[in-house]
Amino acid sequence: MKLSILVKAMKRNNGFRYDYCIAECSEHFLDDVCKPVCIDKGYSDGGCIGLAPNFKCCCKK
């Protein structure tokens, strides 16, 4: 039940409204790399989001 609620919440707002995922995050590609890449692409913010171990670098408008 709790997982179902979490999945529905993530589908509704994709984490924190990060709507464009550009890459898989790894130990060498974390928030400190993801955020500048998103900003360079014209987005306002970026971060590694998702459920472990499948974090994705996603950008926010």
From Swiss-Prot:
Pfam families given in the database record: Defensin
Residue pairs linked by disulfide bridges in the UniProt entry: C21-C59, C25-C48, C34-C57, C38-C58
Listed GO biological process terms: defense response to fungus; killing of cells of another organism
Family: Belongs to the DEFL family.
Lineage: Eukaryota, Viridiplantae, Streptophyta, Embryophyta, Tracheophyta
UniProt KW Ribonucleoprotein keyword: no
Protein name: Putative defensin-like protein 72
Native source species: Arabidopsis thaliana
Keyword Disulfide bond: yes
InterPro entries, per the entry: Defensin-like_dom (IPR056373)
Keywords: Antimicrobial, Disulfide bond, Fungicide, Plant defense
